[in-house]
Amino acid sequence: MNIWVDADACPAEVKDILWRAAQRWQVPVTLVANQLLRVPASPWMRAVQVPRGFDVADAHIVASAVPGDLVITADIPLAAEVVGKGVAAMSWRGEVFDAGSIGERLTMRDMMEELRAGGVDIGGPAAFGQADRRAFANALDAAMQRRARTRGAGGKPGVV
């Protein structure tokens, strides 16, 4: 299992949680961004800088992630694309995206885009807060626990 992070706008708190999880669970975490990222020295964490451009980081993640991996993103179209490949995905707020939920989330996102394009001021997401941090940490821990149980039961390694 690898964890792929859409890191361009990823909150620092999420990166900290991921660093601790990488050490604890000894799982590779790759931060993908179109800017230079500094990561703590660790055999489990690395950063990949992709060229600037629309969805270049997303394309790298889609090309790299395989079933059994986990993608961390707030980008609903990216989540939909990796879920379509059989890759698990979750948001920075701990929302798990799966085949059953991603279609609805994509429809809602598209509707909001249309409203914005039509001049409707719908605001944006709330600031990332303590409750979001806890929800993400709990969702990530649950995914890692499932992975550990699956591997311990002789199942396919890396299934989230």
From Swiss-Prot:
InterPro entries given in the database record: UPF0178
Top-level taxon of the source organism: Bacteria
Pfam families named among the record's database cross-references: DUF188
Family, similarity comment: Belongs to the UPF0178 family.
Protein name, per record: UPF0178 protein BB1267
Species of the source: Bordetella bronchiseptica (strain ATCC BAA-588 / NCTC 13252 / RB50)
